[in-house]
């Protein structure tokens, strides 16, 4: 026969579970704050290419022990129309490209050649 579970025991079990969850949340939040991470956005404002850079904050966001991404950041940011968002990634993609959408120029209707019917070789008219 199963043990009878009264409402008092159930309430006590629930409160212990909630207390344990609360302490785990505090530990996780404390660990994130100790690592120096916060909820505020620490990324600089995106800068369009072709404009001279006045700050050096963007390359500093790339991890300091990875020189290939930093070496790739400088030429790529100076030769493209978009801009790049540096990030720390375990997967090796330390730069996220952001490319602008470019509108195609409107073509006038006079530039399209007129459609001519093809004469049937068997029935010339």
Swiss-Prot record:
Residues 1-20, 38-74, 105-125 are annotated as: Disordered. It comes from the Eukaryota. Pfam families: SOSSC (PF15925). Residues 1-16 have a biased composition (Polar residues). One of its GO terms (cellular component) is nucleoplasm. InterPro entries: SOSSC. One of its GO terms (biological process) is DNA repair. Belongs to the SOSS-C family. This is SOSS complex subunit C homolog A. It comes from Drosophila willistoni (Fruit fly). The lineage of its organism: Eukaryota, Metazoa, Ecdysozoa, Arthropoda, Hexapoda.
